[in-house]
Amino acid sequence: ALARFETIRAHGALKMGLIESLDEAATRQHTPKVAFVAPPVAHRVSSGREVMPDDVDLLARALSMGLLHHAMMGTAAVALGTAAAIPGTLVNEAAGGGARDSVRFGHPSGTLEVGASARSQNGVWQVERVSMSRSARRLMQGEVLVPGDSF
């Protein structure tokens, strides 16, 4: 399955003008990002917490450097948020369709909300804004022993 996604990513890079031949795709693995989306269902994230369908508008999984990402990359998140803001896109439809200025999506590590607005001018979509916030995760917990005469 990952090989098929890589083929899709390579052809996307070619169509977008990021590469000149499919052979170059292997040397440019960081873009474009490939993600897949689905309507929300109850699921457990990597911490064990259960996310209910009402907690999110859609589910999203993204690939980075040929592998499924353990969470959600910021670049993929803003792209998904923008696609959700454009009526009729696959992302917009997976999120329930219609006009929207934000989308909440579930990913393997939790949930993320992204705001976006875009408008169509002469049949060309222009992104006006995209916003998101992220929560920090604990990187370390411990104690530091400082001698009392240090102060």
Where do the language-model regions lie?
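Non-transmembrane, aqueous-exposed alpha-helical and coiled segments at domain scale
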Residues: 1-151
